[in-house]
Regions:
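Well-ordered mid-protein domain cores that form the structural environment of catalytic cofactors
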Residues: 22-76
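Short hydrophobic beta-strand that contains or immediately precedes a catalytic carboxylate
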Residues: 6
Length: 307
C-alpha cells in the first residue's frame, strides 16, 4: 500500500475539494474510505484517509496508484498552504485480520485497549523512530487491524505476530486470499471494478459520495451507462474469472470484472460490468459463459456472504 502524509493549515479544506466525501466529519484518530476523482468523475484511486491531527492526514492509496495519486494532488496544490510527503518506500503496512485479531493485537500491545477502538478508529503510539499507527481498518470483510510503521520496526513486529505467545495462531496470507475475502464481502478492487472511466455511482458505491457531489454526478451521467453489479452462479461450475461473458437470454450484456469460488459456500461469486438494466434475484434470466458452456447466474445484493 502507499503512504502519503498531508499537512498544513489548509489541508482539510483543500482535501475536501478533491475527495468524494466530507473530511469535516472525520474526527481526530478516525479514518474513512474515499475516492480521489478526476475532472470527469472517474476514480483515480480508492483510498483510506486517516486523520492524525487537526491539520495532519495520512492517506493510503493502492501501491499501484501512488504515482497517479501524487501527480494529481501535486497538480492541485496551487497556492494552498498544504504539504505532501510520499513515504510509500519507507512505511510498512501489516494487516492483522480475522475474528481473533483483537486478542492477538492485545497481546502485542498490552498498553492499548483495543476493545475500545471502534471500526475505523486509530491510535498513535510511539515507535522507535516515529509514531506508529494502529487502526481498526482492513479490506477483508472481517474484523481486524492495520499497522503502519517504519521498515525496521515492521520487520520486528512481523516476527512477534507470527511467534506470539497469546495462544492465537497467526498465519501468513497472500493477495490471493485477500482477493477471495474482499469478493465475498462485496468490496471492489481498483483496476477491476474501479477505474478512471467509471464514477463511484456506476461502481455501486454512491453511499461513499457526499450528497452534493452525488447529485452532480447523477445529473452529468445518464442512467443507461454501464454499472458494476454482484452475482452468484447457481450451478456447480468452474470459477468465474475476469473477462467471462454474462448473458441475458442470448444477448451478451457484460463481462466479469472479478470472480472466484467462495471458500465459505463453494459457489461462484463475483462482480460484473453490465450494459443493461438488470433485476436482482432472478434465477432463470441470466447466465455466465465458462469454458464453452453457460451456467445459470443470479444478480444479488453485494456482500451477500456476510448479510
Amino acid at each position: 500500500m502507499g503512504a502519503v502524509f498531508i499537512s498544513g493549515r489548509e489541508s482539510a479544506v483543500w482535501l475536501n475539494k478533491h475527495l468524494a466525501n466530507d473530511i469535516g466529519s472525520l474526527a481526530i484518530e478516525q479514518a474513512h474510505y474515499s475516492f480521489l476523482l478526476n475532472d470527469g468523475g472517474g476514480v483515480i484511486d480508492d483510498l483510506i484517509i486517516y486523520r492524525l491531527a487537526e491539520d495532519v492526514f495520512f492517506v493510503v492509496p493502492n501501491a499501484s496508484g501512488v504515482d497517479a495519486v501524487m501527480a494529481h494532488l501535486i497538480g492541485c496544490i496551487g497556492e494552498a498552504d498544504v504539504r505532501l510527503e510520499n513515504r510509500s518506500g519507507s512505511v510498512v503496512s501489516i494487516a492483522v485480520q480475522g475474528s481473533m485479531a483483537e486478542s492477538l493485537m492485545q497481546s502485542i500491545f498490552p498498553e492499548i485497549g483495543f476493545d475500545r477502538l471502534k471500526k475505523n478508529d486509530l491510535k498513535l503510539v510511539d515507535g522507535k523512530s516515529d509514531s506508529m499507527i494502529l487502526a481498526r481498518t482492513g479490506y477483508t470483510g472481517s474484523d481486524g487491524f492495520e499497522i503502519f510503521t517504519d521498515i525496521e520496526e515492521g520487520r520486528a513486529l512481523w516476527e512477534r505476530l507470527l511467534n506470539n505467545n497469546s495462544g492465537v495462531e497467526c498465519h501468513v496470507c497472500g493477495l490471493g486470499s485477500r482477493d477471495t475475502l474482499r469478493i465475498e464481502a462485496g468490496y471492489p478492487l481498483y483496476g477491476n471494478e474501479l477505474n478512471t472511466s467509471l464514477t463511484p455511482i456506476q461502481a455501486g458505491l454512491g453511499f461513499f459520495v457526499g450528497a452534493e457531489l452525488k447529485q452532480t454526478l447523477k445529473e452529468q451521467f445518464p442512467n443507461n451507462l454501464p454499472k458494476v453489479v454482484y452475482f452468484k452462479v447457481l450451478e456447480k461450475a468452474p470459477p468465474p474469472r475476469n473477462g467471462y461473458e454474462i448473458f441475458e437470454g442470448e444477448s451478451s450484456i457484460g463481462k466479469v470484472t472479478s470472480g472466484c469460488l467462495s471458500p465459505l459456500t463453494g459457489e461462484g461469486i463475483g462482480f460484473a460490468l453490465v450494459n443493461s438494466k438488470i433485476s436482482l434475484n432472478e434465477s432463470e434470466k441470466y447466465s455466465i459463459f465458462i469454458r464453452n458452456r453457460k451456467y445459470s447466474l443470479m444478480f444479488v445484493k453485494r456482500g451477500i456472504i456476510y448479510s
